[in-house]
Amino acid sequence: AASLHKSYASELNVVGWAMGGTVTRMADWLRYIDGTGGAGFAVAALGGISSVDNDLQWVQDNLTPLGKIVLEKSKHSCMYKNLLEEAYKRFISDTYFQGGSAFFENSDAMYALNKYNLGADGSKVPSAPVFMFHARNDIVVPYAMAQGTARSWCQQGAQIRFTTYAGVEMGHTSAGIASLPDVLHF
C-alpha cells in the first residue's frame, strides 16, 4: 500500500506507514519459503496472486486435482491452518500444477512476480515516512530482502526508519509483537 499510495489512493492523507517482516521480492521469497515449515505461506501467496493477476492465470488453469483441493482449502482457512497442513511441502512443483517444477525458469512467471517487488520501481516509492522493522533471525522472510528494499527506497528519496530486532528470540511473529510500542510511537 505504501508504494502504491500515489497511484491508487492519493486522496488519502497518509502521514506514515509501518511494516515489518515484509515480503519485498516475491519470486525470491517463494523460492526461499517453498518446502520449508512456512510453505503454507507460499500456497496462500501464489494462490491469491494467481487468482487476480492475469499474467499468472496459467497457474490457476494448470492446477492438478490435488492443487485445486489445496488452493480451495487455503482460501477458506486461517493462515495457521495452512501453515500446519502444508508445512515442508513443495507447492511450486508438478504435483500441484502442471509446469510447477519449471516455474522459476518461466519468463512470464518471473515478469508477473517481479511486478510485486518493492523498491525496484522509482515511481512506486512511499511519499509518507515509513517505519520498517524486521528480525535478523526471521525464518519466514529473509532479513536481507527488507533491508535491501529500505536502502533502495532511501536512495529514491523515501524517508525510512529501519529497526532491526537482533535478539535470538526475535523471529517473524515475535518481532511484530515487540515492535508495537515503536509502531505506535512512530
Regions found by a protein language model. Name each.
Residues A1-Y8:
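Short glycine-enriched nucleophile-adjacent loop
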Residues A18, F131-F133, T163:
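Hydrophobic/aromatic beta-strand patches that form the interior of the parallel beta-sheet core
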